Every structure is written in structure tokens, then in C-alpha cells.
Amino acid sequence: MGIDINHKYDRKVVRRRPKSENVYLGLLVKVYRFLARRSGAKFNRIVLKRLFMSRINKPVISLARVTRFMKKPGRENLIAVVVGTVTDDLRLYDVPKLRLCALRVTERARARILKAGGEILTFDQLAVQAPKGKGTVLMQGPRNSREACRHFGPAPGVPHSHTKPYVRSKGRKFERARGRRKSRRYKA
């Protein structure tokens, strides 16, 4: 009699290529796969890995955040590299002169960067200018700012938990009784 070996956990889920069928993304992957193999630079390995990522793991980054990162001492004239989208931020009054490389830059963000005398590069241009990632600053948007992430963590109702409950309605009767009023068992 044989034994039933559970193969439930055998498959290691790692992206070796992007899920997207975008041909331009595929060409970038070819370029950076070559650079990652031949240059030995860690920068190229990271960019390649991020090109494979899902949209959730390539969150957008605002122009304000890019500016904040580039204002740190010693980062003048370096190229900001974002494997994702850069969006405009209306709260940012003055846009400094930036050199930026991103997969996509929204129309308004692009206009503001160029108006400030900045430069926007594509990843194939970056591969020519900085094949080993020299003179670049790699950055990414906040991954846990999605609304869905607020529901992750210790169960709502557990002490010191700030996890958002999944509630069908925000009325008086929903998640506002037990533990919150004396008439319903206890008030904490």
C-alpha cells in the first residue's frame, strides 16, 4: 500500500517573467536580463525583479515623494529611478530640477518636471547612460497604502489592534455594541 505524499506546498511561486503581455515591457526585460547577467551589478538585478512584479507591488509614487527623496544631501544631479508610475502632487508647490527615469509618468507630472528644466528618461535610455546603475537613486511607492492593507493584522476587537473590520454598513447597530456600551455585556 502506498503512502499519500502531500504535494500542496511543492510549487515555489516566483516570477521569472512578467505576467503582462506588453511587448515593450518584454523588450525592457530582455535588456535588463542581459545587463543583470553580464554586468554583475546589483542595481540591474533589482530593476529586473521589479519589472516582473504585479501592479500591487509596483505602487505609484507621487512627485512630492520623489522630490523629498532627492532633496537628501549628496543626491544632487543623480537620476531618480522608479520601476512604476510617477504621478503629480498638487500639494507640491515648487518642483525642483529633476532627472527622472520611470516606466510611466502622468501627463501633468511630466509637464511640471519639464517646465522646471528637468529631464525624463526611459529605461532603455538609462541602460545606455548608466548600465551599472552608477549615479542613480532607486525608489518605490508605499506598498501598504492600499485600502485593503488596513484590514490586515491582528483581528479587529483584539486589544491594541488597529485593524479595520469588514463591515457591510457603518450604522449604529454594526460593530458598535458589545464592548462599547454597558447594555451589551460590557463597556471597555
From Swiss-Prot:
This is Large ribosomal subunit protein eL18. Residues 152-188 are annotated as: Disordered. Signal peptide: none annotated. It is found in: Cytoplasm. It comes from the Eukaryota. Keywords: Cytoplasm, Ribonucleoprotein, Ribosomal protein. It comes from Ixodes scapularis. One of its GO terms (cellular component) is cytosolic large ribosomal subunit. The keyword Ribosomal protein applies. Pfam families: Ribosomal_L18 (PF17135). The keyword ATP-binding does not apply. Residues 161-171, 178-188 have a biased composition (Basic residues). SUPFAM superfamilies: Ribosomal proteins L15p and L18e. GO terms for molecular function: RNA binding; structural constituent of ribosome. GO terms for biological process: translation. Belongs to the eukaryotic ribosomal protein eL18 family.
